[in-house]
UniProtKB/Swiss-Prot annotation:
Protein name: Small ribosomal subunit protein uS2
Taxonomic lineage of the native organism: Eukaryota, Fungi, Dikarya, Ascomycota, Saccharomycotina
Described purpose of this protein according to its UniProt entry: Required for the assembly and/or stability of the 40S ribosomal subunit. Required for the processing of the 20S rRNA-precursor to mature 18S rRNA in a late step of the maturation of 40S ribosomal subunits.
SUPFAM superfamilies, A to Z: Ribosomal protein S2
Any single Pfam family the record assigns to this protein: Ribosomal_S2
Family: Belongs to the universal ribosomal protein uS2 family.
Gene: RPS0
Organism from which the protein derives: Candida tropicalis (Yeast)
Alphabetical list of PROSITE patterns matching this protein: RIBOSOMAL_S2_2 (PS00963)
Gene3D superfamilies documented for this protein: Glucose-6-phosphate isomerase like protein, domain 1
Compartment annotation: Cytoplasm
Positions of post-translational N-acetylserine modification: S2
Region ranges (Disordered): 212-261
Length: 261
């Protein structure tokens, strides 16, 4: 697929894809994914052609932008590393996010409370999101998937070749897809305007790591505040010399004795 010159992969985006390890595929190759292999390293790892990855991102974004109602796009991720990414993608594009376990019958059983009728489904991994793809095939819903070299392509209409197992790779692909959708819709005015959202927002973060960082920051603040509090409350044990006669003030004991009881 050839793209117009304005849609070409920029050097900055190419560096992002390489920095996020999007180009590192699996050692096994499924027959339909062979066109996306750039070459194979001596250790057996297949290098993905990031030019093909970018072409599929642009194609997928045009498909998403062509749907009038953004809520009719369902984004799914059973894989832990992709759940934060799909939630952020849904927040920025208006899609419907299904993060975590996909409940069987979401697309086919209209009796369930979670029943949905999307016009397009996007999944993070065809293996972990196999149930969503299977139900989409029953009701003729097109599917866009992030596929590694060993991912099955059955019932997948548009495959975005990438490393769909690394947290940085998954987050970066969803970020690029969201940015391209906003460009296609005209929310980002032109292709030279930078998007204010950073790719880091789409990366998976370990809850325990977040709590640990928060605890360390709180501990650091306490250690900084402790010396200041000690300096404020330090008592020297000295009293000011006051001349009661000159000031016109009398000690409390003399006042009590002079008063009329």
């Amino acid at each position: 697929m050839s793209l117009p010159a304005s849609f070409d992969l920029t050097p900055e985006d190419a560096k992002l894809l390489l920095a996020g390890n999007v180009h590192l595929g699996s050692k096994n190759v499924q027959v339909h994914n062979k066109p996306y292999v750039y070459k194979t390293r001596p250790d057996g790892v297949n290098i993905i052609n990031i030019g093909k990855t970018w072409e599929k991102i642009v194609l997928a974004a045009r498909i998403i932008a062509a749907i009038p109602n953004a809520n009719d796009v369902a984004v799914c991720s059973s894989r832990t590393f992709g759940q934060r990414a799909v939630l952020k993608f849904a927040a920025h594009t208006g899609a419907t996010a299904i993060a975590g376990r996909f409940t069987p019958g979401n697309f086919t059983n209209y009796i369930t409370r979670s029943f949905k009728e999307p016009r397009l489904v996007i999944v993070t991994d065809p293996r972990t999101d196999a149930q969503a793809i299977k139900e989409s095939s029953y009701v003729n819903i097109p599917v866009i998937a992030l596929t590694d070299m060993d991912s099955p392509s059955e019932y997948v209409d548009v495959a975005i070749p990438c490393n769909n197992k690394g947290k940085h790779s998954i987050g970066l692909i969803w970020w690029l897809l969201a940015r391209e959708v906003l460009r296609s819709r005209g929310i980002i005015p032109d292709r030279t305007t930078e998007w204010s959202v950073m790719p880091d927002l789409y990366f998976y973060r370990d809850p325990e790591e977040i709590e640990q960082n928060a605890a360390e920051e709180a501990k650091a603040e306490e250690t900084e505040e402790a010396p200041a509090a000690e300096a404020e409350t330090e008592w020297t044990g000295e009293t000011d010399d006051v001349d009661w006669a000159d000031s016109g003030a009398t000690p409390a004991a003399e006042d009590a004795a002079a008063s009329n009881w």
